[in-house]
């Protein structure tokens, strides 16, 4: 059984992508200072998932170009939305099997970096990613409003059907 926190991440990802529907590559590359452009934000979240769930969790670096160009504090740029969505899809698809394997016990483990445990736990990283998506989703929607886009998606979509609250099940060994 997939951990409830992972289900929340998946819903969050789907909402992030839903908020990009109908935007042109040109508009996604427009920057309103001090914000980054929408396409950069997509690359940035691909960077975070790759860093946390591929590199820290599995020792893999699938897209070094994403690591260099979209890290926290990285240089502003206006990449192609199509290219960033492709990178995001590649990275999230590679992350998913690890996410599917998560248990409550694993989420409580300290992250290992350079062979040593650090202060973060995998559960903390998962929460950071979820909240980070919502931050940039809001930023992206603000940019779309500035651009004059209309009929934008409504906040949190169909959460009741797609991501209802699910308690951890103490008697379920996959959650332990």
Task: For each feature predicted by the language model, list its residue ranges.
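Acidic/histidine-rich alpha-helical segments that form the ligand environment
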Residues: 73-113, 121-135, 175-176
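Short, contiguous alpha-helical
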Residues: 6-10, 17, 25-71, 113-176
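Hydrophobic alpha-helical core bundles mediating ligand binding, dimerization, or RNAP-core interactions
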Residues: 9, 13, 20, 88, ...
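Short, flexible helix-adjacent loops and helix caps
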Residues: 21-28, 104-107
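Short, charged, low-complexity loops and linkers
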Residues: 1-5, 74-77
């Amino acid at each position: 059984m997939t951990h409830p926190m992972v289900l929340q991440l998946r819903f969050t990802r789907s909402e992030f992508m839903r908020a990009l529907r109908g935007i042109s590559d040109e508009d996604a590359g427009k920057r309103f200072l001090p914000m980054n452009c929408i396409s950069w934000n997509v690359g940035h979240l691909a960077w975070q998932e790759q860093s946390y769930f591929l590199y820290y969790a599995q020792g893999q670096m699938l897209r070094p170009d994403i690591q260099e160009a979209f890290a926290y504090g990285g240089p502003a740029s206006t990449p192609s939305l199509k290219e960033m969505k492709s990178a995001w899809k590649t990275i999230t698809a590679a992350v998913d099997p690890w996410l599917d394997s998560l248990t409550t016990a694993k989420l409580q483990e300290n992250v290992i970096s350079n062979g040593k445990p650090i202060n973060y736990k995998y559960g903390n990283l998962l929460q950071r990613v979820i909240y980070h998506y919502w931050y940039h989703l809001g930023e992206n929607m603000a940019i779309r409003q500035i651009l004059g886009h209309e009929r934008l998606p409504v906040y949190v979509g169909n959460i009741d059907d797609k991501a209802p609250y699910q308690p951890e099940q103490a008697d379920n060994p996959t959650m332990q």
